[in-house]
């Protein structure tokens, strides 16, 4: 799929690079998995000659250094003498080199340095503090595990706390871009097709690309692709969140499945799970940024709180894939499709509301957008 959207982000990244010609810049780029962070960075800096891309694979530090040295030798056309086994030595070399030669350095999956060697973060802090005044480096670090990136840069006990000079959060595509993409692949698309693409992918770049590249451009085709045997989407929710949640993932999954199924108040969820949930809900909201709490518009007290899953893909995944996983395990995917078709209109009614809210936000014409409800129910305003 060709590159769509992200013009504001590209402009901002290019402005940051220009600023780095005067003084060192340290930018963190965050966003959920598959949101197109890497593609965005490569696109923004495709014309930058001295641009280095380091991917933090789950290897030993020595193996990573060999990969990084290969990239440096290829891009900078400079021989690196001797064997380098510590990332700190590479980082120090690049900061010192940037004092005479501007460099853009992208480090992808930055949080995985914690697995490789946690002391890398404190080494970077010391090297950065000693060299940043004279350096002309555009350092961009990118990460997908939100909770870890948050700890690394926003926990005041961590060595890199406060070192960033800027932050960019890559969000899903807005409605206008989703519409542009679908019309490119299916000029005769219907409103139902557009709503299905928004519902199943949430505008997440890689999910949209998978649908389009597979020729799934109608509502029916998208539903079939979403729940097909061995579909990427079936396993994605679990793969995406297990690393975030760790050993407690089953309890978090149960909470998210209940919220996705319409149990949106703490009381409703606790009455089903029979446990006290304030700690879990707080973490889901603040540490993982997966749910948000809502109160009725204009209400000033914290009453009538409802919780929602913010990510459309996870919302549909927990509503159908996780909830009916037993059907998938025995190959009853056609039965699952019947379940989805039966409740599709009701389910997507809320998604349609979210779509129009996203459109209003994108227009930048409104100062406040929210719903109103009381104990009797929600009013359509």
Where are these regions (language model features)?
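Mid-core helix/loop region of P-loop NTP-binding domains shared across ATPases and GTPases
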Residues: 78-107, 112-115, 123, 127, ...
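A cross-kingdom feature that marks ATP-driven nucleic-acid transaction machinery
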Residues: 2, 297, 303-381
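Interdomain hinge/linker elements that couple catalytic modules in large macromolecular machines
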Residues: 167-319
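N-terminal pre-P-loop "Q-motif" helix
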Residues: 2-15
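Conserved NTP-binding/hydrolysis module of P-loop NTPases
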Residues: 49-52, 62-81, 95
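Sensor-1/coupling segment of RecA-like P-loop NTPase cores
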Residues: 27-31, 112-116, 126-157
